[in-house]
Regions:
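Loop-to-transmembrane helix entry/capping segments in MFS-fold secondary transporters
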Residues: 83-98
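Symmetry-related core transmembrane helices of the 12-TM Major Facilitator Superfamily/SLC fold
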Residues: 126-134, 166-192
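Hydrophobic core of transmembrane alpha-helices in multi-pass small-molecule transporters
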Residues: 55-71
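Structural signature of the two symmetry-related core transmembrane helices
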Residues: 32-47
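Intracellular juxtamembrane helix-capping segments at the cytosolic ends
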Residues: 69-84
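Loop-to-transmembrane helix entry
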Residues: 1-13, 55-58, 168-174
């Protein structure tokens, strides 16, 4: 099953389950729903990187989607609640500043982390260097990978499994989970400490 097809299951799950999830979380306070949603999201996202098994990944995407459905809509509701009546539009606009900052730094930080821990091309190049293999220059990533597989008498699928077992790129799930748990913890502290003083 193609990776592009598998990622579409997130949208499918949202179409199927959004009304059910919304009916459950609508009774919850926005921050409680956001904390719960982001926690479930983090677990789901981490699990998608834990295994190569497609069915396992589909279940992990479902977990992620449920968290996304529980947490994301409540962000807008929370902004609407804390904003003064005459400044709701201004607050809504400002609420996208963290998203902008996150997108900028995520590209810089996550790219380096992913490349060092889980990028298939980088892992393959490391494997080539360790084995002392020699390959022609100017190959595309796919052609490079196929040439490496040929030189070690493996199919591309077998080489993928070998790299997965030897270099453990799935360990990046720990980074994803740590970020998610950190975010959830900060929201919890905000709810219990900072937000409590404003009530």
């Amino acid at each position: 099953m193609d990776a592009e097809f598998v990622t579409n299951f997130d949208a499918l799950y949202i179409i199927i389950f959004q009304i059910i999830v919304s009916s459950v979380v609508m009774r919850m306070k926005p921050l409680k729903s956001m904390i719960s949603g982001f926690l479930v999201c983090s677990i789901g996202m981490a699990l998608t990187l834990f295994s190569q098994n497609v069915l396992f990944t589909l279940v992990a995407i479902l977990i992620f989607s449920l968290g996304e459905m529980a947490g994301s809509p409540k962000i807008t509701e929370y902004i609407g609640r804390i904003a003064p009546h005459d400044k709701k539009a201004l607050y809504m606009g400002y609420s996208f500043i963290p998203v902008f900052i996150g997108n900028v730094f995520a590209g810089i930080i996550s790219g380096v982390v992913y490349q060092n821990m889980a990028d298939k091309v980088m892992i393959t190049r490391q494997f080539v260097a360790e084995k002392g293999l020699h390959l022609p220059d100017g190959l595309s990533n796919n052609a490079y990978f196929e040439h490496v597989a040929q030189q070690v008498n493996l199919t591309p699928h077998e080489l993928t499994n070998l790299l997965w077992n030897e270099y453990s790129p799935s360990n990046i799930w720990m980074v994803i989970l740590a970020i998610g748990l950190g975010t959830t913890l900060l929201l919890y502290i905000y709810d219990r400490v900072i937000n409590k003083t404003k009530r």
